[in-house]
Amino acid sequence: MKKTIISTLVIGLVSGCSNTNLLKDNLASEQSVINLSKSSNEAKSRNIEFLSGAYLSERKVPKHDIKFSGKYVEFESKSPIELIDVLDGLSKQYNIQYVFSDELEDENSEENKKSSGSSSAKKIKYSGPLAGFFDYLSSAYNMHFEFGHNNLVKAYHYKNQVFNLQQYFDDNKFSSSMQIGGTSGTSSGLKGTADTAIESNSWEKIDEFLSASLGETGKFTIFEDYSLVTVKARPDKFLLLHTFFDKLINESKMQIAVDYRVVSLSEERLNQLAAKFGIENAGKYSITSDMVDAISLSQVGGGLGASYRSASARLDAVVNELSQEVMHEGHFIGIPNRVMPLNVTTNSKYISSIETTKDTNTDEETRTVKVSDLVTGFSMMVMPKILDDGRIQISSGFSRKQLVSIGTAQGITLPTVDENESMNTVTMNPGEVRLAMLFKDNYIQNSNGVQLLGGGTENKKSARYIAVLVGASSYKTNDLASNRVNIYD
């Protein structure tokens, strides 16, 4: 056989085999190696499976393994009967084997007295497919049925299920604090203290929900490190569980882009804009969300076109028309119910006290100088939430501290600072722009002062308005792992 192959190759070369034919042979050889490698990889990958849902432990038996799936049943009881009597009838008629695989715990508990079970008698009336009859019995008796091979039906008082949330929740405990600001208050679920902070922890929410929902006999375990939740409860509890987890999963697949601008403008500018857009009460005017809407719609209509749904584009349009100075701007991207923090601060040192100590024996004086920190700048926290109707609710905290002037007295530094802090909640449609907060800023500047957030250094008292504008958009992420891949086809 070897001789034949070698001889054939020699003949091919002598007869002037072209380079093209040699190239084809090489390609065919390479393709053969590639196909062999693919087959080897597929054989090694048969233990890998991408899940289409969050539920690991619910095993579905293929239809061809349920030999009675195509049969029809009519069942009607003239008086209430227990589940065991129903299963006895099915066993005789359709040769179905059944077994009760667990027992009802604490049968005398208030929960189990109110709930159905295998010992509860019910009036039964059903006509339809035999496989669907078990769904009917599950609802009537609050039982869970699993179908095995050889026509075996297992009846459970409790259902066990593992919820896998790994692809939806990572390390999802988030906290944020404002590095500046000292006023206190509480608004919209935000916690305001001397160290203003927001914290979000989905696992705590899941724990609270399960504790309140599973009843006296329900049990659950949360494995945060593996993002798994195991639940054992009566079957009627799982509809609520599925609704709850599906909502969390759907929210975690959403991403929210939040844009913000902190702008300043004068009272004169406000009056001009009020007159331009026909807004009344210009003499005592302060900016309103109506003006923001009017500017936004006007600018969009003026040619933004495809950018209509872009919150960033609409926000820029509002800022260009409205503001005299952009103090801060930023862009957050995250998922719902997660804190998005921003701290832009400057830490300065100043002499806060001088202590003099005199030695009575030597008349020598010792001076101790104490230096303190002064943090100025800007802090912001944003926590977005997607409502059931698709709108976006943004809870935000804003804190700003600026150094107005510095004086001295007997060697001690006397800084004058201006603080503003606010917490609020705004609700908007995706792509819209809203006024998050507004405050009037009166400040005094002198030649020795230091003005941190804009402005000059003239010796006069000035007034301006500081506005925080927020825009948000939401979109659904493409999660390849959520698509089921059947590697056996």
From Swiss-Prot:
Membrane topology: Lipid-anchor
Residues with lipid group (S-diacylglycerol cysteine): 17
Keyword vocabulary terms for this entry: Cell membrane, Lipoprotein, Membrane, Palmitate, Signal, Transmembrane, Transmembrane helix
GO CC aspect terms: plasma membrane
Residues spanning the membrane: 174-190, 294-308, 402-417, 442-457
Lipidation (N-palmitoyl cysteine): 17
Domain of life: Bacteria
Subcellular location: Cell membrane
Signal peptide: 1-16
Free-text function comment from the UniProt entry: Involved in TCP pilus biogenesis.
Protein name stated in the entry: Toxin coregulated pilus biosynthesis outer membrane protein C
Species in which this protein is naturally found: Vibrio cholerae serotype O1 (strain ATCC 39315 / El Tor Inaba N16961)
